[in-house]
Amino acid sequence: MPSLKDLRNRITSVKATQKITKAMQMVAAAKLRRAQNAAENGRPYAERMAQVLGNLAGNLIGGVGAPRLLSGTGQDRVHLLVVCTGDRGLAGAFNSSIARLARDHANRLMADGKTVKIITIGKKGLDVLRRQFRDQIIASRDIRGNKPVDYPFAAEIADDILARFEAGEFDVATLFYSEFRSVISQIPTAQKLIPAELPTAEGASATGAGSDAAMEFEPNEETILETLLPKNLTVQIFRALLENAASEQGARMSAMDSATRNAGEMIKKQTLIYNRTRQAMITKELIEIISGAEAL
C-alpha cells in the first residue's frame, strides 16, 4: 500500500497535469475559431475554381491540346504522395490517421509494382512515415511552429511539386490531409492533384457553375487552363492546409478536454484512497493507544 506522502505527491502531480491540459484546451478552443473560419471561407473559392476549370476542360480531357496537369503523362508508374500533418502532438489521432491513410495507399501501390515517392508537410508525418519509407521520402517541410499557414507557403509547396512534375520525376500526385467537419469529426482525405480531378461540365452545371448558353473564351480554353491549373494546384494545397489547421485544433481541443476530465476522475479516485488510508492509520493508532492504556 502506498504511503500518505506518495499519495499526496501523486495527487499533486495529477492536479498539475490537469492545469496544463485545461490550459491547452482553452488555447486550442481560441485557435479553433480562427482556423475554422479560415477553412470555411476557403472552401467556396477552391470549389468554385475547380468548377470553372471543369467547365473549361470539358471538351479537352483526353483530347489534343489538353495541358499535362490535366491529361497527365499517360503513364501510371511513379506516384508522389504529399502528406500534410502537424508539427505538434497531443492532438488525439489527428496526425496518425493521416499518416496511416498515406501508408496504406503507399503499400497498395508498391504491392502493384508502382514506384512511390513521398513529400511530408509537418514533423509528425515525417516521424511516422520514415520508419517504413525512409528511402521513399524525397523532401519534407515544417508547418512553421504555431504560425498560421498562409498562401505563400502553399505556393512554395505547389511550385516544388510542379517543378518535379515538369522534370518527369512522377506521373501521379496525391494529397493527404484531414477534412474538418466538427470538433469531434475530422476525416482523413486523399485528393488527386495531378492529373487534376475536376468536376465535369454536367456536374458544374448541376451546381450552378455552368450554363446552357454558348460561351466563347479569349484567349482560348487551352491558354486559360495553362495559366489557371498551376494556380489551382496552389489553391487546393492551401485549402488542405487550412482544413488541416482546423482539424488539428479541433482534435487537440477534444483530446485535452478528455484528458482534463480523466485527470479529474483520477484525482477523485486518489483522494478517496488517500482519505481511506489516512482513516485506517488513525484508527490503527487509536487502537494502539487504547490497548496500551488498558494494559496499564
From Swiss-Prot:
It is a peripheral membrane protein. The keyword Protein biosynthesis does not apply. Pfam families: ATP-synt (PF00231). It is found in: Cell inner membrane. Keywords: ATP synthesis, Cell inner membrane, Cell membrane, CF(1), Hydrogen ion transport, Ion transport, Membrane, Transport. GO terms for molecular function: ATP binding; proton-transporting ATP synthase activity, rotational mechanism. The keyword Ion transport applies. GO terms for biological process: proton motive force-driven plasma membrane ATP synthesis. It comes from the Bacteria. GO terms for cellular component: plasma membrane; proton-transporting ATP synthase complex. CDD domains: F1-ATPase_gamma. PANTHER family: ATP SYNTHASE GAMMA CHAIN, ATP SYNTHASE SUBUNIT GAMMA, MITOCHONDRIAL. Belongs to the ATPase gamma chain family. F-type ATPases have 2 components, CF(1) - the catalytic core - and CF(0) - the membrane proton channel. CF(1) has five subunits: alpha(3), beta(3), gamma(1), delta(1), epsilon(1). CF(0) has three main subunits: a, b and c. Produces ATP from ADP in the presence of a proton gradient across the membrane. The gamma chain is believed to be important in regulating ATPase activity and the flow of protons through the CF(0) complex. This is ATP synthase gamma chain. It comes from Methylorubrum extorquens (strain CM4 / NCIMB 13688) (Methylobacterium extorquens). The gene is atpG.
